[in-house]
Amino acid sequence: MTRRNRIIIIVYTITILLSVMYATQPLQPLLAKEFNVSMTKASSFTAVIMLFLAISPIIYGYILESVRTRTVLKIALIILLITNFSLSLANSYEMFLTIRTIEAIVIPAILTGAMTVLAKDKENTKLNMSIYVAATVFGGMVGRVFSGFIAEEFGWRVVFASLSLALLAAYFFINKIEFKGDANLVKPKLFDIVHILKDRRYIVIYTLMFIVFFVFAGLLNILPFRIKELLPQTSETKIGLLYLGYGMGILISLTIHKIIKFFKKELRVIMAGLTVFLISTLLFLNSDAIILFWTVFLFCVGMFTVHTVSTRLANSMRASQRGLTSGMYLSFYYIGGAVGSIFPAIIYDKFGWDMTVFMFATLLVFIFAFILLSRKLFKAYD
């Protein structure tokens, strides 16, 4: 199999995987009504995935040690195919959440396997990692947009049945890949983690991404409920279209080198991204649905700018243990997403939309000040 075909298969698999992860997000108001549960409980369908993505860099290095990458991909895809089809048959909140929890366990294994296949191509590592990031962003957008459309036209159960067919195709394609490498997994030790956290630069970067993804995941998770509050007759298709702005992440990830060149230093780019992120967060106080739609685009530009540059910094500040520093980065990132998928929903339910947005803005002002006061730690700024 040619390198090009192998990459196409991996990109397709990642796209479908991220679609599975985020398909529930625009459907949460519909699922909350279907299962007669609160907004907070409906938000847990996404939060549980984030939680396992957070702990996977820590535990999967031990669980999947010396397992063939293709074997990991095949077994995990079969499990995901079965569970996703089971979602289309679920008739209670408890059953749906249990199945999503099983999916949350296997999704990190597929992501790890896909990244390993791309990383083994040593001559094109940087290009392949850019492709990986773009594929995850594209998958997240496709999953959100199309799940809304399919749910409105054919019912929410068809969303998960159709994704199961897409996973079946992914399993068929993965069988065609000729790849004998082992999964490249980190097995962290407590001493190594503590040693890295003694470097204050990592405290800054990890805190930054915890807060940024808390705000990002939190706001996008409750946005469908806000739209339903403003316009009760809004269809699932229109809610799904709100997430088109997510596609800005592809543009940012593929042009970040030009953005850095313009600002000259990475930390300046981060602070510019935070400024855009804060301004767009405050724009969500507006009650005009059209303005909210375009605000999502600006919101995603700010977030993905910070995320892309922070990833580069986290992977370049140490010559050794890059696998561990990267894994810890992802853990803090997804812990922020997991907490952000639940806690803001509680605040919104108890205190309303405006108070929730002000909470997000306060956190962003705090992290902006923290970065500003810590700038001398980074040579990139000077």
Ranges and model annotations:
Residues 177-205:
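Juxtamembrane intracellular "pre-TM" segments in multi-pass secondary transporters
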Residues 5-39, 57-60, 219-225:
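Extracytoplasmic
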Residues 83, 94-103, 290-298:
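Paired small-residue
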Residues 317-353, 360:
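A late C-terminal transmembrane helix in Major Facilitator Superfamily
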